[in-house]
A protein has these predicted regions:
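Short alpha-helices
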Residues: 105-170
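Short, hinge-like loop/turn segments at secondary-structure boundaries
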Residues: 64-68, 118-119, 266-267
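Solvent-exposed alpha-helices and their adjacent loops that cap or buttress functional pockets
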Residues: 71-73, 92-94, 108-109, 139-141, ...
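Conserved beta-strand segments of alpha/beta enzyme cores
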Residues: 46-48, 98, 115, 138
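Short, motif-level signal for alpha-helix interfacial/capping segments enriched in acidic residues
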Residues: 1-6, 81-82, 132-134
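Active-site cofactor/cluster-binding pocket
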Residues: 59-114
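Hydrophobic helix-and-loop "lid/oligomerization" segment in the mid-to-C-terminal part
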Residues: 2-22, 27-59, 69-77, 155-310
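Glycine-rich, phosphate-binding/catalytic loops in enzymes
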Residues: 33-35, 95-99, 117-118, 169
Length: 310
C-alpha cells in the first residue's frame, strides 16, 4: 500500500491535504508532516491545505510556509488524514480527481481510492512516521516535530492504551531529527496564569452524576474566561484522575455552528459508539460528539450511565 501511495503522489502535480473538523494535535501534526514529506521527497509539487486554520494549536507548530487553499484548476490528488468518515472531513473532497485516506480510527468508511487504515495505531502521525521510516522518504526537522506532536497529543504523552512498541519506534525515529524536545513540550503543555482561572472555574462548577463528571462552558463563560471554544475543551482531563469518575466530559458552546461540542474521555468504558450516536466519533476511550442543544445532554448522560452499569 505504501508503494501505491508514493506512486500516486508522484503522478500528480497538485495535491491537497485534508483532515477532520475541530482539529487536534494529531490532525494538524499528520497534515503538516505529510506536507513536509511531499515537499522534501518529490519535485515540482504544488501542495495545498484544506480546512480551518484558526485554531490556537496552529501557532504551536511554528509553520513558516504559506497555508494556501487549492483552486482545483489542475487535476488534484486529495490526501485525507486522521478522519474516519466523509462527514468529518474539513473541506470538499469531491473536487479532487482521486483520494487517499490515511487514518487510525475504527474503520467505518473507506472513502478513498487508496485506503491506509490501521485502527490499532495510536495516531495517524504514527502511521505517517512509520511510513517514512520504512520507505526512507525525506523529512525535515519541522515535519518530524509536527509528527511527534501528533503522537504525543493523541497518546497523551504515551499514557493511553493504544500506545505500543510501534508508537515508541515511530517516536524514536522522529527523535533522531534535530528539534528541541524541551521547547516542543513547553509549547504544548506550558500553562499561563489565566489557565489557573479556568481550572478554578471548572472545579467550582463541574457536575458529577453517577460516575460521570462534566463541565459546561457557555459562550458567556468562554468570554469571561477569555478563551476560545477549542481551548475550553482542552481542560477535559482536569477531571481524569479521580477514581470515582469513570467517564468525564467537556461541553462547550459553539456559537458559530449553533451547537455544543462534547469531548468524551474514560479509562475503561468505551465511549466511541455513544459519540457516534451524537454526531461524532473517535476512539474507544477518547471521542467527540455534537449536541444540537443542551436539551440533548440528559439523553447523552443516560446513555453513558447505562454503559457504565453494563
Amino acid at each position: 500500500m505504501i508503494e501505491k501511495i508514493l506512486k500516486k503522489i508522484d503522478e500528480y502535480e497538485c495535491i491537497c491535504l485534508y483532515r477532520h473538523v475541530n482539529p487536534d494535535y494529531d490532525a494538524f501534526g499528520s497534515q503538516f508532516g505529510m506536507y513536509d514529506l511531499i515537499q522534501n521527497t518529490f519535485e515540482n509539487k504544488e501542495v495545498y491545505f484544506a480546512g480551518d486554520f484558526s485554531s490556537d494549536l496552529v501557532a504551536k507548530y511554528q509553520f513558516t510556509g504559506e497555508i494556501n487553499e487549492p483552486n482545483f484548476e489542475k487535476p488534484t490528488l486529495g490526501i485525507v488524514l486522521d478522519t474516519a468518515n466523509q462527514e468529518r472531513i474539513d473541506g470538499d473532497i469531491s473536487l479532487c480527481k482521486e483520494i487517499i485516506k490515511i487514518d487510525h480510527h475504527i474503520v467505518v468508511d473507506s472513502y478513498g481510492n487508496l485506503n491506509l487504515e490501521d485502527s490499532t495505531a495510536s495516531s495517524c502521525s504514527q502511521i505517517v512516521a512509520l511510513f517514512l521510516k520504512n520507505k526512507r522518504v525525506k523529512l525535515s526537522s519541522f515535519g518530524a516535530e509536527a509528527l511527534y506532536m501528533g503522537i504525543i497529543g493523541d497518546t497523551n504523552r504515551f499514557m493511553y492504551s493504544a500506545t505500543d512498541e510501534r508508537t515508541f519506534e515511530a517516536a524514536m525515529y522522529l527523535y533522531n531529527y534535530d528539534f528541541d524536545m524541551q521547547a516542543l513540550y513547553e509549547r504544548m503543555y506550558m500553562k499561563h496564569v489565566k489557565d489557573l482561572k479556568v481550572n478554578a472555574f471548572i472545579l467550582n462548577h463541574y457536575i458529577e452524576d453517577e460516575g460521570v463528571a462534566y463541565y459546561v462552558l457557555k459562550d458567556e463563560d468562554l468570554k469571561y474566561l477569555n478563551i476560545s471554544r477549542e481551548r475550553g475543551s482542552d481542560f477535559v482531563n482536569l477531571l481524569s484522575s479521580v477514581d470515582e469518575y469513570k467517564v468525564w466530559l467537556a461541553i462547550t458552546e459553539n456559537t458559530k455552528d449553533h451547537n455544543w461540542r462534547v469531548s468524551m474521555r474514560s479509562r475503561h468504558i468505551p465511549v466511541n459508539e455513544i459519540a457516534n450516536k451524537y454526531r461524532g466519533g473517535g476512539h474507544a476511550f477518547a471521542s467527540g460528539a455534537t449536541l444540537l442543544s443542551l436539551d440533548e445532554l440528559p439523553l447523552l448522560l443516560n446513555d453513558i450511565k447505562e454503559r457504565i452499569n453494563e
